[in-house]
Amino acid sequence: MKTLCFLLLTSGLLYLMVKGVGSHPGTFHVRIKCMPKMTAVFGDNCSFYSSMGDLCNNTKSVCCMVPVRMDNI
């Protein structure tokens, strides 16, 4: 029984490595970009702003999280 579980686990992991996690059409991924605060305030299209810890550690920039459909990549 342990051998069967081990084989199922390894085959599942191999499938994910070959296929890719979240690479199915219709799924959403989040792309994060840093932009100057003035650009963010004055019209750059961003659906969600956040402070992402050390990612945008400059006080003059903000993080923009943009949902991207896998069909568009």
Swiss-Prot record:
Localization per record: Secreted
Which cysteine residues pair off into disulfide bonds?
Answer: C34-C63, C46-C64
What keywords would UniProt list here?
Answer: Antibiotic, Antimicrobial, Defensin, Disulfide bond, Secreted, Signal
Q: Which InterPro entries match?
A: Defb50 (IPR035193)
Pfam families (alphabetical): Defb50 (PF17546)
Q: Describe its function.
A: Has bactericidal activity.
Would you indicate the residue range of the signal peptide? 1-23
Q: In which tissues is it expressed?
A: Highly expressed in prostate. Not expressed in uterus, epididymis, ovary, testis, spleen, submaxillary gland, thymus, thyroid, pancreas, smooth muscle, skeletal muscle, heart, kidney, lung, liver, eye and brain.
- Give the source species: Mus musculus (Mouse)
Biological process (GO) annotations?
A: defense response to bacterium
Q: Which family does it belong to?
A: Belongs to the beta-defensin family.
GO cellular component terms attached to this protein's record: extracellular region
> What protein am I looking at?
Beta-defensin 50
Q: Which domain of life is it from?
A: Eukaryota
